[in-house]
Amino acid sequence: MIEADRLIAASGRDREEVQDRAIRPLSLDEYIGQPVVREQMALFIQAARGRGESLDHTLIFGPPGLGKTTLANIIAHEMGVSVKSTSGPILERPGDLAAMLTNLEPHDVLFIDEIHRLSPVVEEVLYPAMEDFQLDIMIGEGPAARSIKLDLPPFTLVGATTRAGMLTNPLRDRFGIVQRLEFYNDKDLSTIVSRSANILGLAIEDQGAYEIARRARGTPRIANRLLRRVRDYAEVRGKGQITKAVADMALNLLDVDERGFDHSDRRLLLTMIEKFDGGPVGVDNLAAAISEERHTIEDVLEPYLIQQGYIMRTPRGRVVTRHAYLHFGLNIPGRLGEGGDFSEPGDE
């Protein structure tokens, strides 16, 4: 199974990039959710513009699909400058980075997605560019090689990553602003769904938007993807209007349940419960039982289930929690305890 094949995958798809561009917010006023990040960035941007300076280099990290690219574009828009975009894997040689840096105008934004994947040799070139706005490049080869310095216009590097822990300390320390994006709550996601529907010219009720939002795993990219699929259902079977009932029927047809789980999530949980008595079970045994690769379980399936409190990692292996039994309407084993709060995660 490939992550991008799943309807609820947080990673982006090439065609979606074009579709999402039409519904992306362009300013902080349009930006929904992440209140702390929004307030801080508004303050930093206003201060930088007031001084006539470029914004400090900014690192944005968090799970995929939460709007890191969107925020980078908003920063450029609010600063009134252009944004040049690239990604870590694309910048293979120092010359690739040098070409982008030398084409920047004063105060422009250079956005590097997946910045944790920069090669060490490219990263070394980036250090003086970030710190001193200078580019050190080598001319010639062998004994005749010499280093020259090129002055760069002041610019803002905005780096985005899903794995902040993989950044080297020297690179991380050169960012003056560091922002973490959190998963969205259902209310903010519902507002995002309603806004996207309005831009796309769709008729949607508030309850319909909320039904989509609560199954979107706290991720705007997934919410917008589900909205497009529910739109298809509404146009064919729902008279074009997205109500709560239409959204519920569409998402059930798409095999996305009320917790945002799909078939793969449920199969993993049920396998642990039915074949391994809830665990502990080693990841290799689990991979063999559900015919998946080990890395698929570790990188694709597990993270959301752990974050939502349905699976725990222990020294002896993976264990399901009482919430997994409750989700499927199963009796909770006595070893998990009879007392305490048996509500599912997220319930009040």
Swiss-Prot record:
<dbReference type="GO" id="GO:0048476">
    <property type="term" value="C:Holliday junction resolvase complex"/>
</dbReference>
<keyword id="KW-0234">DNA repair</keyword>
<feature type="region of interest" description="Small ATPAse domain (RuvB-S)">
    <location>
        <begin position="185"/>
        <end position="255"/>
    </location>
</feature>
<keyword id="KW-0227">DNA damage</keyword>
<feature type="binding site">
    <location>
        <position position="65"/>
    </location>
    <ligand>
        <name>ATP</name>
    </ligand>
</feature>
<feature type="binding site">
    <location>
        <position position="69"/>
    </location>
    <ligand>
        <name>Mg(2+)</name>
    </ligand>
</feature>
<feature type="binding site">
    <location>
        <position position="69"/>
    </location>
    <ligand>
        <name>ATP</name>
    </ligand>
</feature>
<feature type="binding site">
    <location>
        <position position="24"/>
    </location>
    <ligand>
        <name>ATP</name>
    </ligand>
</feature>
<dbReference type="InterPro" id="IPR027417">
    <property type="entry name" value="P-loop_NTPase"/>
</dbReference>
<dbReference type="InterPro" id="IPR036388">
    <property type="entry name" value="WH-like_DNA-bd_sf"/>
</dbReference>
<comment type="subunit">
    <text>Homohexamer. Forms an RuvA(8)-RuvB(12)-Holliday junction (HJ) complex. HJ DNA is sandwiched between 2 RuvA tetramers; dsDNA enters through RuvA and exits via RuvB. An RuvB hexamer assembles on each DNA strand where it exits the tetramer. Each RuvB hexamer is contacted by two RuvA subunits (via domain III) on 2 adjacent RuvB subunits; this complex drives branch migration. In the full resolvosome a probable DNA-RuvA(4)-RuvB(12)-RuvC(2) complex forms which resolves the HJ.</text>
</comment>
<feature type="binding site">
    <location>
        <begin position="131"/>
        <end position="133"/>
    </location>
    <ligand>
        <name>ATP</name>
    </ligand>
</feature>
<keyword id="KW-0963">Cytoplasm</keyword>
<protein>
    <recommendedName>
        <fullName>Holliday junction branch migration complex subunit RuvB</fullName>
        <ecNumber>3.6.4.-</ecNumber>
    </recommendedName>
</protein>
<feature type="binding site">
    <location>
        <position position="313"/>
    </location>
    <ligand>
        <name>DNA</name>
    </ligand>
</feature>
<feature type="binding site">
    <location>
        <position position="174"/>
    </location>
    <ligand>
        <name>ATP</name>
    </ligand>
</feature>
<dbReference type="GO" id="GO:0016887">
    <property type="term" value="F:ATP hydrolysis activity"/>
</dbReference>
<dbReference type="Pfam" id="PF05496">
    <property type="entry name" value="RuvB_N"/>
</dbReference>
<dbReference type="Pfam" id="PF05491">
    <property type="entry name" value="RuvB_C"/>
</dbReference>
<feature type="region of interest" description="Large ATPase domain (RuvB-L)">
    <location>
        <begin position="4"/>
        <end position="184"/>
    </location>
</feature>
<comment type="similarity">
    <text>Belongs to the RuvB family.</text>
</comment>
<feature type="region of interest" description="Head domain (RuvB-H)">
    <location>
        <begin position="258"/>
        <end position="348"/>
    </location>
</feature>
<feature type="binding site">
    <location>
        <position position="70"/>
    </location>
    <ligand>
        <name>ATP</name>
    </ligand>
</feature>
<dbReference type="InterPro" id="IPR008823">
    <property type="entry name" value="RuvB_C"/>
</dbReference>
<feature type="binding site">
    <location>
        <position position="221"/>
    </location>
    <ligand>
        <name>ATP</name>
    </ligand>
</feature>
<dbReference type="GO" id="GO:0009378">
    <property type="term" value="F:four-way junction helicase activity"/>
</dbReference>
<dbReference type="InterPro" id="IPR008824">
    <property type="entry name" value="RuvB-like_N"/>
</dbReference>
<keyword id="KW-0233">DNA recombination</keyword>
<keyword id="KW-0238">DNA-binding</keyword>
<dbReference type="Pfam" id="PF17864">
    <property type="entry name" value="AAA_lid_4"/>
</dbReference>
<keyword id="KW-0067">ATP-binding</keyword>
<keyword id="KW-0378">Hydrolase</keyword>
<feature type="binding site">
    <location>
        <position position="318"/>
    </location>
    <ligand>
        <name>DNA</name>
    </ligand>
</feature>
<keyword id="KW-0547">Nucleotide-binding</keyword>
<feature type="binding site">
    <location>
        <position position="23"/>
    </location>
    <ligand>
        <name>ATP</name>
    </ligand>
</feature>
<dbReference type="GO" id="GO:0005737">
    <property type="term" value="C:cytoplasm"/>
</dbReference>
<dbReference type="GO" id="GO:0006310">
    <property type="term" value="P:DNA recombination"/>
</dbReference>
<dbReference type="InterPro" id="IPR004605">
    <property type="entry name" value="DNA_helicase_Holl-junc_RuvB"/>
</dbReference>
<dbReference type="InterPro" id="IPR041445">
    <property type="entry name" value="AAA_lid_4"/>
</dbReference>
<comment type="function">
    <text>The RuvA-RuvB-RuvC complex processes Holliday junction (HJ) DNA during genetic recombination and DNA repair, while the RuvA-RuvB complex plays an important role in the rescue of blocked DNA replication forks via replication fork reversal (RFR). RuvA specifically binds to HJ cruciform DNA, conferring on it an open structure. The RuvB hexamer acts as an ATP-dependent pump, pulling dsDNA into and through the RuvAB complex. RuvB forms 2 homohexamers on either side of HJ DNA bound by 1 or 2 RuvA tetramers; 4 subunits per hexamer contact DNA at a time.</text>
</comment>
<dbReference type="GO" id="GO:0000400">
    <property type="term" value="F:four-way junction DNA binding"/>
</dbReference>
<dbReference type="InterPro" id="IPR003593">
    <property type="entry name" value="AAA+_ATPase"/>
</dbReference>
